[in-house]
UniProtKB/Swiss-Prot annotation:
The N-terminus interacts with KaiC, while the C-terminal histidine kinase domain autophosphorylates and is probably responsible for self-oligomerization. The N-terminal domain stimulates the C-terminus to autophosphorylate. GO terms for biological process: circadian rhythm. It catalyses: ATP + protein L-histidine = ADP + protein N-phospho-L-histidine. Homooligomerizes. Interacts with KaiC. Participates in the KaiBC complex, whose core is composed of a KaiC homohexamer and 6 KaiB. This is Adaptive-response sensory kinase SasA. Coiled coil: none annotated. The modification Phosphohistidine is found at H155. Its EC number is 2.7.13.3. Residues 152-365 form the Histidine kinase domain. GO terms for molecular function: ATP binding; phosphorelay sensor kinase activity. Member of the two-component regulatory system SasA/RpaA involved in genome-wide circadian gene expression. One of several clock output pathways. Participates in the Kai clock protein complex, the main circadian regulator in cyanobacteria, via its interaction with KaiC. KaiC enhances the autophosphorylation activity of SasA, which then transfers its phosphate group to RpaA to activate it. In addition to its output function, recruits fold-shifted KaiB (KaiB(fs)) to KaiC to cooperatively form the KaiB(6):KaiC(6) complex (independent of SasA kinase activity).
């Protein structure tokens, strides 16, 4: 039997509540493609809403976190959340299809008639258990998000403090005047104040909501980062080579976070480069949608079996020499920042031939991001 004909299909109305950056998740993209292209036995209507634009949806549907998929029709309403939304939907579609077949045959929809070996009470308990699992996944996701936010902000605090210390050392050596020193310290204190506000918002704000993407000149951000670390490379006679095209398009990114990524990668490159060595920073407009950044050094390199691990949380590689302390948690923060922007970050390295870190940043699109 072919089941219910297309013109007799029941409407399946779904609402996906997700922020723009969350829609770049591979599982959500796969789910949307599945609902648009696959024959799942329903006439599917999928609506999408951004919680930042429609915050009332969170209260209306009692959503603890996003992304969340809500089945509005047919009733009863169901909410899918956590890291396995697509898998949950696929599992439930099978049960909904069974309901359609039974209805088409004019039979009762009592669960006991779908599966004689299981009582209606057992199925109700199974549904309740599924809801509890979903809520547990959502709470775990929220706790993990808060932990990531704390780690990111704590790591970011190092940047203005380091810059202030370097400015103090330069002023004491007579390399900058008192006015320049005061200007640097004031700007760094302003940064620390902003970071302290982020810390206060951790409990009420998702990590991703601390990002404020805008039309940004990434070349200028890189130049500022190089200048900020000037003392680190000048004192060690390290040459920094840059290749940034004059026609490089603007990117759509958060200024503070992109600056943090470039500072961290440059600082690592300088740390692993011997005195008199070379560090390069290159930007390329590879496609109409992405700018690719590469930061390379001629240090000791990174073992192949460690090249994935260095981007994981809480991973710190052993020191490679007496003068270096190894890669710290900064790279995991960099990875999360880049991924929130929809980009990717990776490393290419061989022992004793240095390392090149690559990342992609989305190009600012005039029509879609104004």
């Amino acid at each position: 039997m072919d089941g219910v004909k297309a013109n007799q299909r029941q409407q399946l109305q779904l609402l996906l509540v997700a922020a723009r950056h969350q829609l770049s998740r591979s599982d959500l993209r796969s789910m949307i493609q599945f609902l648009e292209n696959e024959d799942c036995g329903f006439n599917v209507t999928l609506q999408m809403a951004d919680p930042s634009e429609q915050p009332e949806l969170l209260e209306l549907h009692r959503l603890v976190a996003t992304p969340a998929l809500i089945k509005l029709s047919p009733t009863p309403k169901q909410v899918f959340a956590g890291s396995s939304i697509f898998q949950q939907l696929q599992n439930w579609i099978t049960r909904w299809q069974q309901d359609i077949v039974v209805t088409g045959l004019g039979l009762s929809l009592r669960p006991t008639e779908l599966d004689g070996s299981r009582t209606q009470r057992e199925l109700q308990l199974e549904d309740q258990l599924l809801v509890l699992r979903q809520e547990n996944e959502t709470l775990i996701d929220r706790l993990n998000a808060q932990e990531r936010t704390l780690r990111m902000v704590a790591h970011e605090l190092r940047t203005p403090l380091t810059a202030a210390v370097l400015a103090l050392q330069s002023q004491q050596l007579g390399q900058i005047n008192i006015e320049h020193f005061q200007d640097v310290v004031k700007r760094r204190l302003d940064e620390i104040e902003l970071l302290s506000k982020d810390l206060l918002e951790v409990k009420s704000t998702k990590w991703e909501d601390l990002f404020n993407p805008q039309n940004l000149d990434l070349g200028n951000i890189a130049a500022e980062a190089i200048l900020e670390l000037e003392k680190l490379w000048l004192d060690r006679n390290i040459e920094i080579r840059t290749d940034i095209p004059s026609d490089l398009p603007k990117v759509f990114a958060d200024q503070r976070r992109m600056r943090q990524v470039l500072l961290n990668l440059l600082e690592n490159a300088l740390k692993f480069t011997e005195d008199g060595g070379e560090v390069s920073l290159t930007m390329l407009h590879r496609t109409s949608h992405w700018v690719q950044v590469s930061i390379c050094d001629n240090g000791p390199g990174i073992p192949e079996d460690e090249q994935e691990r260095i981007f994981l949380d809480r991973v710190r590689l052993p020191q490679t020499s007496v003068s270096t302390s190894g890669f710290g948690v900064g790279l995991s923060v960099c990875r999360r920042i880049v991924e929130v922007h929809g980009g990717k970050i990776w490393v290419v390295s061989e022992p004793d031939k240095g390392a090149c870190f690559y990342l992609t940043v989305p190009v600012w699109q005039r029509n879609g991001q104004e």
